[in-house]
Amino acid sequence: MSEAFDLAVVGAGTAGLPAAMAAAARGLKVVVLEKSGRIGGTLHYSSGQMSAAGTQLQRARGIEDSPDLHYADVMRISRGLANGPLVRRAVDLAPRTIDWLMEIGFEMHPSCPAILHLHEAYAIARTYWGVDGGRSILKAVAPVFEAARARHGIDLRLGTATTRILPGEGVMARRPDGTEARIAARATILATGGYGANPGMFARLHAGMPLYTTASPTSDGSGHAMAEALGATLRNMHFWKPALAGIEDPAGSGRVAWEDVPALTPQVRQPWEIFVDAGGRRFVAEDHESVDIREAALARLPGLAFWVVFDEEILREAPPLLPRFDRARLEAAFAGHPHFVRADGVEALCARTGIDADGLR
Protein backbone atom coordinates (compact mmCIF):
# COMPACT_ATOMS: atom_id res chain seq x y z
CA MET A 1 0.00 0.00 0.00
CA SER A 2 1.30 3.45 -0.87
CA GLU A 3 1.33 6.08 1.84
CA ALA A 4 -1.63 8.46 1.71
CA PHE A 5 -1.43 12.23 2.13
CA ASP A 6 -3.93 14.99 2.63
CA LEU A 7 -2.15 17.22 0.12
CA ALA A 8 0.35 16.79 -2.70
CA VAL A 9 2.19 19.99 -3.63
CA VAL A 10 3.73 19.78 -7.09
CA GLY A 11 6.75 22.08 -7.17
CA ALA A 12 9.07 23.29 -4.41
CA GLY A 13 9.56 26.88 -5.52
CA THR A 14 8.18 30.33 -4.84
CA ALA A 15 4.59 29.14 -4.39
CA GLY A 16 5.07 25.50 -3.44
CA LEU A 17 7.23 26.05 -0.37
CA PRO A 18 4.88 28.43 1.48
CA ALA A 19 1.85 26.39 0.37
CA ALA A 20 3.34 23.27 1.91
CA MET A 21 4.30 25.08 5.11
CA ALA A 22 0.87 26.66 5.51
CA ALA A 23 -0.95 23.38 4.95
CA ALA A 24 1.31 21.43 7.31
CA ALA A 25 0.91 24.08 10.02
CA ARG A 26 -2.84 23.45 9.84
CA GLY A 27 -2.38 19.77 10.52
CA LEU A 28 -2.44 18.37 7.00
CA LYS A 29 -0.15 15.56 5.98
CA VAL A 30 1.83 17.00 3.06
CA VAL A 31 4.10 15.61 0.36
CA VAL A 32 6.09 17.98 -1.89
CA LEU A 33 7.16 16.66 -5.30
CA GLU A 34 10.01 18.51 -7.02
CA LYS A 35 11.34 17.28 -10.34
CA SER A 36 14.73 18.99 -10.02
CA GLY A 37 17.38 18.10 -7.49
CA ARG A 38 16.90 21.19 -5.34
CA ILE A 39 14.23 23.41 -3.87
CA GLY A 40 13.77 27.00 -4.98
CA GLY A 41 12.50 26.78 -8.55
CA THR A 42 12.67 30.15 -10.28
CA LEU A 43 14.24 31.80 -7.24
CA HIS A 44 17.60 30.56 -8.53
CA TYR A 45 17.10 32.60 -11.71
CA SER A 46 14.75 35.52 -11.09
CA SER A 47 15.43 39.04 -9.88
CA GLY A 48 12.93 38.38 -7.10
CA GLN A 49 11.14 41.72 -7.31
CA MET A 50 8.06 42.13 -5.10
CA SER A 51 5.64 44.94 -4.35
CA ALA A 52 3.71 45.75 -1.18
CA ALA A 53 2.05 48.80 0.37
CA GLY A 54 1.91 49.59 4.07
CA THR A 55 5.04 47.70 5.13
CA GLN A 56 7.15 48.37 8.19
CA LEU A 57 10.01 49.41 5.89
CA GLN A 58 7.84 52.06 4.26
CA ARG A 59 6.69 53.42 7.61
CA ALA A 60 10.28 53.56 8.86
CA ARG A 61 11.17 55.72 5.84
CA GLY A 62 8.14 57.96 6.12
CA ILE A 63 6.46 56.60 2.99
CA GLU A 64 2.69 56.87 3.21
CA ASP A 65 1.07 53.99 1.36
CA SER A 66 -1.77 51.51 1.67
CA PRO A 67 -3.22 48.42 -0.02
CA ASP A 68 -5.99 50.63 -1.42
CA LEU A 69 -3.45 52.87 -3.15
CA HIS A 70 -1.58 49.79 -4.36
CA TYR A 71 -4.80 48.37 -5.81
CA ALA A 72 -5.59 51.62 -7.60
CA ASP A 73 -2.08 51.74 -9.05
CA VAL A 74 -2.30 48.17 -10.36
CA MET A 75 -5.60 48.91 -12.04
CA ARG A 76 -4.15 52.12 -13.53
CA ILE A 77 -1.11 50.34 -14.92
CA SER A 78 -3.20 47.46 -16.28
CA ARG A 79 -5.78 49.87 -17.72
CA GLY A 80 -8.45 48.08 -15.73
CA LEU A 81 -7.70 44.70 -17.29
CA ALA A 82 -6.29 43.01 -14.18
CA ASN A 83 -8.48 40.55 -12.27
CA GLY A 84 -9.88 42.80 -9.55
CA PRO A 85 -10.60 40.17 -6.86
CA LEU A 86 -7.19 38.54 -7.30
CA VAL A 87 -5.42 41.91 -7.21
CA ARG A 88 -7.37 42.83 -4.07
CA ARG A 89 -6.30 39.61 -2.37
CA ALA A 90 -2.68 40.09 -3.41
CA VAL A 91 -2.31 43.70 -2.29
CA ASP A 92 -4.03 43.02 1.04
CA LEU A 93 -1.62 40.20 1.91
CA ALA A 94 1.54 41.66 0.35
CA PRO A 95 2.67 43.85 3.29
CA ARG A 96 2.37 40.92 5.67
CA THR A 97 4.55 38.89 3.31
CA ILE A 98 7.31 41.50 3.15
CA ASP A 99 7.26 41.98 6.92
CA TRP A 100 7.48 38.20 7.39
CA LEU A 101 10.45 37.94 5.04
CA MET A 102 12.25 40.62 7.03
CA GLU A 103 11.49 38.75 10.27
CA ILE A 104 13.07 35.53 8.98
CA GLY A 105 16.27 37.21 7.83
CA PHE A 106 15.65 38.32 4.26
CA GLU A 107 18.52 40.56 3.15
CA MET A 108 16.75 43.48 1.51
CA HIS A 109 18.60 45.63 -1.01
CA PRO A 110 19.43 48.93 0.73
CA SER A 111 17.68 50.98 -1.98
CA CYS A 112 14.30 49.43 -1.17
CA PRO A 113 11.48 50.24 -1.12
CA ALA A 114 11.95 51.98 -4.44
CA ILE A 115 10.22 53.12 -7.60
CA LEU A 116 11.50 50.71 -10.24
CA HIS A 117 11.39 51.68 -13.91
CA LEU A 118 12.29 48.31 -15.41
CA HIS A 119 8.53 47.73 -15.43
CA GLU A 120 5.75 50.30 -15.70
CA ALA A 121 6.38 52.20 -12.49
CA TYR A 122 4.20 52.52 -9.43
CA ALA A 123 3.45 56.06 -8.28
CA ILE A 124 4.87 55.30 -4.82
CA ALA A 125 8.06 53.53 -3.72
CA ARG A 126 6.72 50.06 -2.98
CA THR A 127 9.01 47.69 -4.92
CA TYR A 128 11.45 45.41 -3.07
CA TRP A 129 14.18 42.96 -3.97
CA GLY A 130 17.08 41.22 -2.28
CA VAL A 131 20.79 41.87 -2.52
CA ASP A 132 21.12 38.65 -4.53
CA GLY A 133 17.85 38.70 -6.43
CA GLY A 134 15.57 35.71 -5.99
CA ARG A 135 18.32 33.80 -4.26
CA SER A 136 17.98 36.18 -1.31
CA ILE A 137 14.38 35.03 -0.87
CA LEU A 138 15.42 31.39 -1.01
CA LYS A 139 18.23 31.95 1.47
CA ALA A 140 15.71 33.29 3.98
CA VAL A 141 12.89 30.82 3.30
CA ALA A 142 14.87 27.57 3.00
CA PRO A 143 15.76 27.27 6.73
CA VAL A 144 12.14 28.00 7.66
CA PHE A 145 10.98 25.29 5.28
CA GLU A 146 13.48 22.81 6.69
CA ALA A 147 12.27 23.61 10.20
CA ALA A 148 8.68 23.05 9.07
CA ARG A 149 9.67 19.71 7.55
CA ALA A 150 11.13 18.61 10.85
CA ARG A 151 8.25 19.92 12.92
CA HIS A 152 5.33 18.77 10.79
CA GLY A 153 6.77 15.85 8.87
CA ILE A 154 6.54 17.35 5.39
CA ASP A 155 7.70 14.68 2.94
CA LEU A 156 10.00 16.31 0.34
CA ARG A 157 10.81 14.19 -2.71
CA LEU A 158 13.44 15.71 -4.98
CA GLY A 159 14.07 14.43 -8.48
CA THR A 160 10.44 13.32 -8.64
CA ALA A 161 8.49 14.53 -11.67
CA THR A 162 4.71 14.54 -11.49
CA THR A 163 3.34 13.15 -14.74
CA ARG A 164 -0.42 13.03 -14.20
CA ILE A 165 -3.05 14.33 -11.79
CA LEU A 166 -5.60 11.89 -10.44
CA PRO A 167 -8.44 14.16 -9.24
CA GLY A 168 -9.36 13.42 -5.65
CA GLU A 169 -6.94 10.51 -5.58
CA GLY A 170 -3.45 11.98 -5.92
CA VAL A 171 -0.87 12.00 -8.68
CA MET A 172 1.33 9.77 -10.77
CA ALA A 173 5.02 10.60 -10.47
CA ARG A 174 8.31 9.42 -11.91
CA ARG A 175 10.94 8.60 -9.30
CA PRO A 176 14.65 9.42 -9.69
CA ASP A 177 15.26 5.84 -10.87
CA GLY A 178 12.72 6.28 -13.67
CA THR A 179 10.00 4.10 -12.20
CA GLU A 180 6.42 5.34 -11.92
CA ALA A 181 4.60 5.62 -8.62
CA ARG A 182 1.08 6.50 -7.56
CA ILE A 183 1.06 8.97 -4.68
CA ALA A 184 -2.28 9.06 -2.91
CA ALA A 185 -3.55 12.48 -1.84
CA ARG A 186 -6.99 13.95 -1.25
CA ALA A 187 -6.02 17.23 -2.93
CA THR A 188 -3.27 18.54 -5.20
CA ILE A 189 -1.76 22.00 -5.57
CA LEU A 190 -0.03 22.76 -8.86
CA ALA A 191 2.89 25.06 -8.06
CA THR A 192 4.93 24.23 -11.14
CA GLY A 193 5.66 27.76 -12.33
CA GLY A 194 5.23 28.97 -15.87
CA TYR A 195 6.11 27.76 -19.35
CA GLY A 196 8.91 30.21 -20.11
CA ALA A 197 11.35 27.39 -20.84
CA ASN A 198 9.09 25.60 -23.31
CA PRO A 199 9.39 27.16 -26.79
CA GLY A 200 6.80 24.81 -28.27
CA MET A 201 4.15 25.63 -25.71
CA PHE A 202 4.99 29.32 -25.91
CA ALA A 203 4.55 29.31 -29.68
CA ARG A 204 1.26 27.40 -29.38
CA LEU A 205 -0.18 29.80 -26.83
CA HIS A 206 1.20 32.99 -28.40
CA ALA A 207 0.57 32.72 -32.13
CA GLY A 208 3.98 31.33 -33.06
CA MET A 209 6.03 33.99 -31.30
CA PRO A 210 9.71 33.14 -30.74
CA LEU A 211 10.94 32.60 -27.19
CA TYR A 212 14.06 34.10 -25.66
CA THR A 213 13.87 33.45 -21.97
CA THR A 214 15.40 34.06 -18.56
CA ALA A 215 13.13 31.41 -17.05
CA SER A 216 14.23 28.49 -14.94
CA PRO A 217 14.70 25.35 -17.08
CA THR A 218 12.06 23.72 -14.85
CA SER A 219 9.44 26.25 -16.04
CA ASP A 220 8.46 23.89 -18.82
CA GLY A 221 4.68 24.17 -18.65
CA SER A 222 4.24 20.66 -17.27
CA GLY A 223 1.63 21.86 -14.78
CA HIS A 224 -0.31 23.61 -17.55
CA ALA A 225 -0.19 20.44 -19.66
CA MET A 226 -1.44 18.24 -16.81
CA ALA A 227 -4.28 20.65 -16.11
CA GLU A 228 -5.20 20.85 -19.80
CA ALA A 229 -5.31 17.05 -19.91
CA LEU A 230 -8.09 17.22 -17.32
CA GLY A 231 -10.05 19.74 -19.37
CA ALA A 232 -8.75 22.95 -17.83
CA THR A 233 -8.81 26.07 -19.99
CA LEU A 234 -5.83 28.42 -20.09
CA ARG A 235 -7.05 32.01 -20.04
CA ASN A 236 -5.55 35.44 -20.70
CA MET A 237 -2.83 34.13 -22.99
CA HIS A 238 -3.09 37.36 -25.00
CA PHE A 239 -1.93 39.42 -22.01
CA TRP A 240 1.80 39.36 -22.55
CA LYS A 241 4.57 41.64 -23.76
CA PRO A 242 8.23 41.08 -24.57
CA ALA A 243 10.87 42.62 -22.36
CA LEU A 244 13.13 45.22 -23.94
CA ALA A 245 15.67 43.73 -24.39
CA GLY A 246 18.04 40.81 -23.93
CA ILE A 247 21.00 39.06 -25.50
CA GLU A 248 20.69 35.41 -26.43
CA ASP A 249 23.69 33.66 -24.92
CA PRO A 250 24.95 31.37 -26.18
CA ALA A 251 23.61 32.12 -29.63
CA GLY A 252 20.92 29.68 -30.67
CA SER A 253 20.11 28.63 -27.11
CA GLY A 254 17.03 30.77 -26.59
CA ARG A 255 18.45 31.68 -23.18
CA VAL A 256 18.93 35.20 -21.82
CA ALA A 257 20.61 36.08 -18.51
CA TRP A 258 18.67 38.86 -16.79
CA GLU A 259 21.91 40.08 -15.22
CA ASP A 260 23.17 40.89 -18.73
CA VAL A 261 20.11 42.81 -19.93
CA PRO A 262 21.23 46.04 -21.66
CA ALA A 263 20.74 49.32 -19.81
CA LEU A 264 17.87 50.60 -21.96
CA THR A 265 15.83 52.20 -19.17
CA PRO A 266 16.01 55.98 -19.74
CA GLN A 267 15.32 56.81 -16.08
CA VAL A 268 18.53 54.92 -15.23
CA ARG A 269 20.65 55.63 -18.31
CA GLN A 270 19.69 58.09 -21.03
CA PRO A 271 20.07 56.51 -24.49
CA TRP A 272 22.98 57.51 -26.68
CA GLU A 273 22.11 54.86 -29.26
CA ILE A 274 19.23 54.48 -31.72
CA PHE A 275 16.88 51.49 -31.94
CA VAL A 276 16.03 50.41 -35.47
CA ASP A 277 14.01 47.64 -37.08
CA ALA A 278 15.05 45.57 -40.09
CA GLY A 279 13.97 48.43 -42.33
CA GLY A 280 16.46 50.75 -40.64
CA ARG A 281 13.66 52.80 -39.09
CA ARG A 282 13.47 53.99 -35.50
CA PHE A 283 10.32 52.28 -34.22
CA VAL A 284 10.02 54.03 -30.84
CA ALA A 285 11.40 57.03 -28.99
CA GLU A 286 14.35 55.50 -27.17
CA ASP A 287 13.87 57.82 -24.21
CA HIS A 288 10.10 57.37 -23.87
CA GLU A 289 9.43 57.29 -20.13
CA SER A 290 6.88 54.46 -20.41
CA VAL A 291 8.32 50.95 -20.64
CA ASP A 292 4.80 49.84 -21.56
CA ILE A 293 4.94 51.98 -24.71
CA ARG A 294 8.45 50.79 -25.59
CA GLU A 295 7.55 47.12 -25.14
CA ALA A 296 4.32 47.52 -27.13
CA ALA A 297 6.37 48.94 -30.00
CA LEU A 298 8.72 45.96 -29.83
CA ALA A 299 5.78 43.54 -29.84
CA ARG A 300 4.75 44.86 -33.27
CA LEU A 301 8.11 44.00 -34.87
CA PRO A 302 8.53 40.77 -36.86
CA GLY A 303 10.39 38.23 -34.76
CA LEU A 304 10.48 40.65 -31.81
CA ALA A 305 13.93 41.71 -33.01
CA PHE A 306 15.65 45.07 -33.41
CA TRP A 307 19.13 46.52 -33.56
CA VAL A 308 20.79 48.96 -31.15
CA VAL A 309 23.07 51.08 -33.34
CA PHE A 310 25.94 53.28 -32.14
CA ASP A 311 29.39 54.39 -33.22
CA GLU A 312 32.85 54.15 -31.73
CA GLU A 313 32.60 57.56 -30.05
CA ILE A 314 29.44 56.51 -28.21
CA LEU A 315 31.09 53.25 -27.19
CA ARG A 316 33.99 55.24 -25.79
CA GLU A 317 32.13 58.14 -24.15
CA ALA A 318 28.71 56.84 -23.08
CA PRO A 319 27.92 55.07 -19.81
CA PRO A 320 28.13 51.30 -20.40
CA LEU A 321 25.26 49.88 -22.41
CA LEU A 322 26.05 46.45 -20.98
CA PRO A 323 27.13 47.13 -17.39
CA ARG A 324 28.51 43.62 -16.79
CA PHE A 325 30.57 43.58 -19.99
CA ASP A 326 34.12 44.80 -19.57
CA ARG A 327 36.04 45.79 -22.71
CA ALA A 328 37.51 42.32 -23.16
CA ARG A 329 34.12 40.61 -22.97
CA LEU A 330 32.62 43.15 -25.36
CA GLU A 331 35.43 42.64 -27.87
CA ALA A 332 34.95 38.88 -27.63
CA ALA A 333 31.24 39.33 -28.34
CA PHE A 334 31.90 41.45 -31.42
CA ALA A 335 34.40 38.86 -32.59
CA GLY A 336 32.19 35.81 -32.23
CA HIS A 337 28.55 36.44 -31.30
CA PRO A 338 26.12 36.83 -34.23
CA HIS A 339 24.07 39.43 -32.35
CA PHE A 340 27.08 41.75 -32.09
CA VAL A 341 28.09 43.30 -35.41
CA ARG A 342 30.81 45.85 -36.13
CA ALA A 343 31.54 47.53 -39.46
CA ASP A 344 33.49 50.49 -40.85
CA GLY A 345 30.43 52.36 -42.12
CA VAL A 346 26.68 52.35 -42.61
CA GLU A 347 26.77 50.45 -45.91
CA ALA A 348 28.99 47.72 -44.51
CA LEU A 349 26.93 47.49 -41.32
CA CYS A 350 23.73 47.07 -43.30
CA ALA A 351 25.32 44.44 -45.50
CA ARG A 352 26.34 42.42 -42.45
CA THR A 353 23.08 42.78 -40.51
CA GLY A 354 20.49 42.81 -43.26
CA ILE A 355 19.25 46.25 -42.19
CA ASP A 356 17.87 48.29 -45.08
CA ALA A 357 20.52 50.89 -45.85
CA ASP A 358 18.08 53.43 -47.29
CA GLY A 359 16.06 53.33 -44.09
CA LEU A 360 19.08 53.71 -41.83
CA ARG A 361 20.68 56.63 -43.65
Please place each PLM-identified region on the residue numbering.
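A conserved short coil-to-beta-strand element within the FAD-binding core of flavoproteins
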Residues: 158-169
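Extreme N-terminal leader/targeting segments of oxidoreductases
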Residues: 1-7, 25, 139
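An anion/pyrophosphate-binding glycine-rich loop and adjacent beta-alpha core
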Residues: 224-226, 230-355, 359
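Conserved N-terminal/central alpha/beta ligand/cofactor-binding core
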Residues: 29, 35-155, 159-160, 272-282, ...
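A structured beta-alpha segment of the ubiquitous adenosine-cofactor-binding alpha/beta core
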Residues: 162, 172-182
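Glycine-rich loop(s) and the adjacent beta-strand/alpha-helix scaffold that form part
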Residues: 176, 183-252
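Glycine-rich, N-terminal phosphate-binding loop of Rossmann-like dinucleotide-binding domains
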Residues: 12, 54, 175, 192-193
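N-terminal Rossmann-like FAD-binding beta1-loop-alpha1 element of flavoenzymes
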Residues: 7-32
